Amino acid sequence: MYIQVLGSAAGGGFPQWNCNCVNCKGYRDGTLRATARTQSSIALSDDGVHWVLCNASPDIRAQLQAFAPMQPARALRDTGINAIVLLDSQIDHTTGLLSLREGCPHQVWCTDMVHQDLTTGFPLFNMLSHWNGGLQWNRIELEGSFVIEACPNLKFTPFPLRSAAPPYSPHRFDPHPGDNLGLLVEDTRTGGKLFYAPGLGQVDGKLLAMMHDADCLLVDGTLWEDDEMQRRGVGTRTGREMGHLAQNGPGGMLEVLDGFSRQRKVLIHINNTNPILDEDSPERAEVLRRGVEVAFDGMSIEL
């Protein structure tokens, strides 16, 4: 299985265009040793030619431009994208669909709840129906697994996550199974397994079992502290309220990941306020000391 990190930041990217927190300002004035990041998205393939896009970031055009296999140039109009899987209906995971309209129709896999949001509150399916067939919906059931024709050796097993629907959603404060998903993806030829959960607010026993079954854990790295947005003066909500488990402290993501010695462990969906973006920070050193990597745009993983 080929895993390509197209974007590794949370919503807004890093540096965020309108933010002057210590990280964003430090990056711009050159006092912070850090790497710019676009908004979270990955691509998966079983042959390095046909790709499944997981979430469509607002930065999708730049992300595709930076990854040569996404333009194989086999025809006058071409793309390496053969299907799209949406893990939720968040704006920073779906807006990129608008920039992919020239390539319609697209095969899009998502749950009933995500499809409901994307046909009502943020009606991308309706809007894009005018472009050569638009978005062709393939329902993700919450039980069992599915296979996408373009990558027949990849088996996708979805699992619901406890997190919130987008602010625009009619059921923002009435969560339903299927609002947010993670994926366990297995390459049935190599046996390699990826656990992918960029928005992970709580880890229960069932998820721990799935994580132990995986070879690579690509998980939520949004915040260092649960109250980080408040500490940085850029927001009022905690990580838990937003559906993100912070890295630091008892029960935090790093403590969870300490329980895995065999797996490759990688943080993704990193918010611009997170001190681990500062490559010279003690927080970054602590992450690395505990055997955890920090995803970056262009990162490649093979399983």
Curated annotation (Swiss-Prot):
What's a Pfam family in this record?
Lactamase_B_2
User: In which pathway does this enzyme or protein participate?
Assistant: Cofactor biosynthesis; pyrroloquinoline quinone biosynthesis
Q: Does the keyword Transport apply?
A: yes
Q: Which GO terms describe its biological process?
A: pyrroloquinoline quinone biosynthetic process
According to the record, the segments passing through the membrane are none
- Read off the InterPro entries from this record: Metallo-B-lactamas (IPR001279), PQQ_synth_PqqB (IPR011842), RibonucZ/Hydroxyglut_hydro (IPR036866)
Alphabetically ordered keywords of this record: PQQ biosynthesis, Transport
- Role summary: May be involved in the transport of PQQ or its precursor to the periplasm.
Family note: Belongs to the PqqB family.
Q: What is this protein called?
A: Coenzyme PQQ synthesis protein B
Q: What is the lineage of its organism?
A: Bacteria, Pseudomonadati, Pseudomonadota, Gammaproteobacteria, Pseudomonadales
What gene is this protein translated from?
pqqB
